[in-house]
């Protein structure tokens, strides 16, 4: 298997911008706009976001981020995505583990997330990694197309 690295990088690189555009198209095909809670590239580049890039043999194949809520003491998992051609190699799991490491290093007590109900593989990964269902949090309201999850750290 080719070498996979995961590191904090800028989301403003051309290859990452293309990956985020691919993610936006994917989510746009699954959910209506009001059920897509996406952080834009400029927000992903802010200091309270830890943006991670997965590379396989140097090529961008995935990403994930943690948005730090210092008032709430938690981090929110955002923008988790692995290109379809790179799936099956544990890259998503490794990204999520690195996000957990970043959250612990920031002194956060929990990771929270919102994901879409039609993403069974992603939901299974979150559950396998110890996330449990919970109600809406932060800026979110109830949405039949959203699933909210939490993992204490």
Curated annotation (Swiss-Prot):
Q: Name one Pfam family in it.
A: Acetyltransf_1
* Protein EC: 2.3.1.-
Q: Which InterPro entries match?
A: Acyl_CoA_acyltransferase, Bact_Acetyltransf, GNAT_dom
Where the record annotates domain N-acetyltransferase, the positions are 4-153
Q: Which GO terms describe its molecular function?
A: acyltransferase activity, transferring groups other than amino-acyl groups
Name of the top EC class for this enzyme: transferase
Keyword field: Acyltransferase, Transferase
Q: Which PROSITE patterns match?
A: GNAT
Keyword Transmembrane helix applies:
no
Q: Mind telling me which PANTHER family this protein's record contains?
A: AMINOALKYLPHOSPHONATE N-ACETYLTRANSFERASE-RELATED, AMINOALKYLPHOSPHONATE N-ACETYLTRANSFERASE-RELATED-RELATED
Free-text function comment from the UniProt entry: Participates in the tryptophan-dependent indole-3-acetic acid production, which is a phytohormone released by A.brasilense.
Q: What is this protein called?
A: IAA acetyltransferase
- What's the source species for this entry? Azospirillum brasilense
